[in-house]
Swiss-Prot record:
This is Polyamine oxidase 7. Optimum pH is 7.0 with spermidine as substrate. Optimum pH is 6.5 with spermine as substrate. Its EC number is 1.5.3.-. It comes from Oryza sativa subsp. japonica. Glycans are attached at residues 103, 150, 278. Keywords: Apoplast, FAD, Flavoprotein, Glycoprotein, Oxidoreductase, Secreted, Signal.
Amino acid sequence: MTKPTTMAIFLSIVLLSMAQLPSLVAGTGRPRVIIIGAGISGISAGKRLSEAGITDILILEATDHIGGRMHKQRFAGVNVEIGANWVEGVNGEKMNPIWPIVNSTLKLRNFLSDFDSLAQNVYKDGGLCDAAYVQKRIDLADEADKSGENLSATLHPSGRDDMSILSMQRLNNHLPNGPSSPVDMVVDYFTYDYEFAEPPRVTSLRNTVPLPTFTDFGDDNYFVADQRGYEAVVYYLAGQYLEADKSGNIVDARLQLNKVVREISYSSTGVTVKTEDNSTYQADYVMVSASLGVLQSDLIQFKPQLPSWKILAIYQFDMAVYTKIFVKFPKKFWPEGAGREFFLYASTRRGYYGVWQEFEKQYPDANVLLVTVTDEESRRIEQQPDSQTKAEIMEVVRSMFPDEDVPDATDILVPRWWSDRFFQGSFSNWPIGVSRYEHDQLRAPVGRVYFTGEHTSERYNGYVHGAYLAGIYA
């Protein structure tokens, strides 16, 4: 028997209260439900409520736009995605719910990412690494990962006897510190950190290997490179129940932008939400779709304080940092063509500007490269001037391509999700030591306060489809 979702229970409670107290909202302007945050999870939660007949809602969004971490920014003459970029998990037995919206309904430009030719595209200081050697190291890493899948399957589903991915690697290759050569480190980084934004030493084996996103929906990833932005998905969902103008901009009064929630008071009879501009809103229920990073900060105060079991659940889970740095050059000096989209830099310093992507197909003639960093490198880079980051990048690319005339970059874009008080990170990662029971507590309601967001998705935390489904099913 399938247990009911939090959203199903929530809908039942709200609908019952509407039947019993029909005059509570009528004529007062008081919404039945306040939703905090207009990312894809908050917007999809509003859509689900509206479909159930609960239309007296109010969405409070801290920024000046909807979409949350699905957000485009103008750079080098094109719109690039500074947050979510891929539809991850496509062409499997099940349909990723985001894919038909992207590919069929909105027809957003997207491109299948080719991760299969990495052995030919690993660079060290001085140029390319030997492809045959790199392939052997990749094969060994793949064997360890497969062993990890087998080991993960033997661990109790509750997660009570979990271990880190690094512990699994130690069991398989008997290296106390895991992969340690430059090539092994960058292959390991690409396999795990590039996916989870945190290293194997902190990431749960039982809850991430294999990843349900790919076992459920397929192994393919499609890179969205449409000038409307990946956020067009959120605007499409919002337009299903909120009034929009001819340009697709939401003009419905039930969506309030630039409303920074600072306090949520809750009792057995209702909730009161206060914002930074001294506005006060009352409702029967509140649904919080703020990021895990925000919940772990002091941006929003709960009165009374959340119970200890809830606080522990919030602080045990990880909010990771994933930074996509876009760099504009006056000309191309890097290889292009089939099998060249991604290339790696094998540094003696793990995670140091390791994963690169060129945009021959996505943004032709833009002369832009993307380099991704995560975790401590992300935090370090966010705190230094962009000029310093640019100088470090120039040193790396000239080291990788010593025989090329590498010009100075003309522009750089460094997103700062960790420093942004409205996000305080990029997406959640499941760390070692957090059981399924504790994750259930993370998404569980506290009285009239409900929670949604990608971090509340048991199978797909950290992903766009996880955020969407969390809003639908909460």
